[in-house]
């Protein structure tokens, strides 16, 4: 997504032609992808107060803080966008995960056992069949417990939305694959009567295929730009009350 020239141009236009004060992003990683893309688009904005980006991997969070330190308006948040127990329950009961064979055109991680894959990712539990990427993820996740006083926060997406509720916002959802739609649902519920801009990444993935369908078919959303090939949609939700 971060190398898509069409999206970069759309974000530049969004920053230039609007008065967005706050950006909320889920999934910082190391800060060199979508976070830097957003920062570059809005660095000249006279209205932007802060870009708030959420990362649960402590190693990535620490690296991102260094990588993004030259942007004085970026606030790197260490923690999870969701309540952990609610996220695990969601993964275990999500119809699209339980019956993923009904969606052959949608990408899903570890189609042989997606529930355990996503639950392991959220819980930090490992077993002999766990993918090496997940093992590395959990190893990094556990680092701050011994080496730092900082502890992860939870429910950060809801908290940040409530903090900036009455302000002009861009919300960017690009978090863990198994709970992307949960993030969309929370955003949609909290902001159901408010105007805001929304960017979804991975619309051809389990993460956001349902949110994308809602955006295309519900009258309170209007699409600014999208790419089915690269899997993103930038849209506007109008005020409804």
List PLM regions with ranges.
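A short alpha-helical cap/connector motif
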Residues: 1-199, 203-241
């Amino acid at each position: 997504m971060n190398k898509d020239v069409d999206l970069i141009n759309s974000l530049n236009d969004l920053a230039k032609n609007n008065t967005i004060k706050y950006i909320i992003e889920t999934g910082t990683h190391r800060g060199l992808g979508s976070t830097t893309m957003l920062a570059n688009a809005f660095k000249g904005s006279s209205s932007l107060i802060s870009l708030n980006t959420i990362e649960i991997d402590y190693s990535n969070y620490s690296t991102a803080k260094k990588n993004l330190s030259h942007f004085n308006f970026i606030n790197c948040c260490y923690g999870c966008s969701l309540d952990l127990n609610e996220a695990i329950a969601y993964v275990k009961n999500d119809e699209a995960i339980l019956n993923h064979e009904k969606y052959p055109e949608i990408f899903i991680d570890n189609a042989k056992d997606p529930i355990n894959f996503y639950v392991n990712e959220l819980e930090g539990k490992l077993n002999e069949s766990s993918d090496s990427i997940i093992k590395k993820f959990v190893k990094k996740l556990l680092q701050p417990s011994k080496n730092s006083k900082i502890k992860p926060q939870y429910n950060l997406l809801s908290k940040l939305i409530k903090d900036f509720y009455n302000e002009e916002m861009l919300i960017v959802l690009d978090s863990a694959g198994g709970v992307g739609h949960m993030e969309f649902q929370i955003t949609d519920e909290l902001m159901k009567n408010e105007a805001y801009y929304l960017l979804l990444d991975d619309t051809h993935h389990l993460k956001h295929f349902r949110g994308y369908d809602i955006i295309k078919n519900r009258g309170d959303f209007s699409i600014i730009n999208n790419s089915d090939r690269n899997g993103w949609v930038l849209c506007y939700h109008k005020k409804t009350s």
